[in-house]
């Protein structure tokens, strides 16, 4: 059987779930006319993250890294090493092959598994990206027997465990447990409820430095600092863009 090309691997990954835009470093390796990208506004989120966190010289973990947009972009921004974790094998295999073709094997370490958030699993990591992962607890990973209330407590337990392992956390959480709109994590589905949940539930372990909120101007999406206006839920933006983006610093590391 012939070895699959990078394009083959990308197209295989695309069949399994929503995926990301290509990082700049990969655009020259994959022909733009042969791929279809379903963006999750990665560029807008990256711009906000980069405005708040300098990763130059840092070891970074990208948990639930999908097709690697943030991993490759943070390497381009000077991260010394990125540990990429992804339980989805097609996604992982694509990122591993792309890292090889770019000569980044020594800086981009790939792990085809889900993070369990146990003690010292991410020890030595300076900054962790945990973007839109934990609302899948009890589904893609974790105890499948959990009910929703127990899952919410486990989400906070995961964040508490991370505070002992990584200095900076970039965090997003979805509004619906397991991605199911019939199982909302919060009664009214508002940003205020989600922010209160994270703020109050992590107060012993994390300092929240900033919260970015998506705003739309024309066709452009940008993340701005939380204020009383953008705190309001915007149904026109859809559920994904209502998710706040937290920049957090550990009280223990």
Annotate each language-model stretch with its function.
Residues 37-56:
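Conserved alpha-helix/loop element of class I SAM-dependent methyltransferases that forms part
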Residues 81-86:
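Conserved SAM-binding motif I beta-strand of class I
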Residues 96-122:
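S-adenosyl-L-methionine
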Residues 126-149:
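A short SAM/SAH-binding and catalytic strip from SAM-dependent methyltransferases
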Residues 154-156, 162-175:
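Conserved beta-strand signature within the Rossmann-like core of class I S-adenosyl-L-methionine
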Residues 68-72:
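Glycine-rich SAM-binding Motif I of class I
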Residues 57-66:
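Conserved class I S-adenosyl-L-methionine
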Residues 179-253:
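Rossmann-like AdoMet/SAM-dependent catalytic core
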């Amino acid at each position: 059987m012939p070895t699959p090309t990078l394009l083959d691997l990308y197209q295989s990954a695309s069949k399994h779930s929503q995926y990301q835009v290509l990082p700049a470093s990969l655009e020259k390796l994959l022909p733009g006319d042969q791929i279809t990208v379903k963006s999750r506004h990665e560029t807008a989120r990256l711009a906000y993250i980069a405005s708040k966190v300098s990763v130059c010289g840092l070891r970074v973990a990208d948990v639930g890294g999908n097709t690697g947009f943030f991993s490759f972009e943070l390497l381009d921004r000077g991260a010394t090493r990125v540990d990429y974790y992804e339980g989805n094998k097609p996604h992982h295999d694509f990122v591993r092959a792309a890292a090889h073709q770019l000569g980044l094997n020594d800086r981009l370490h790939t792990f085809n598994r889900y993070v369990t958030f146990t003690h010292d699993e991410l020890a030595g990591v300076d900054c962790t990206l945990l973007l839109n992962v934990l609302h899948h607890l009890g589904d893609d990973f974790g105890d499948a027997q959990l009910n929703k209330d127990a899952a919410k407590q486990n989400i906070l337990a995961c964040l508490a465990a991370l505070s002992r392992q990584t200095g900076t956390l970039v965090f997003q959480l979805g509004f619906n447990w397991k991605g199911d709109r019939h199982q909302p994590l919060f009664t009214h589905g508002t940003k205020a409820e989600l922010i209160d949940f994270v703020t109050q539930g992590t107060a012993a372990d994390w300092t929240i430095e900033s919260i970015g909120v998506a705003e739309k101007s024309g066709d452009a999406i940008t993340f701005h600092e939380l204020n009383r206006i953008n705190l309001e839920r915007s149904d026109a933006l859809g559920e994904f863009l209502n998710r706040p983006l937290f920049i957090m610093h550990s009280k223990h590391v």
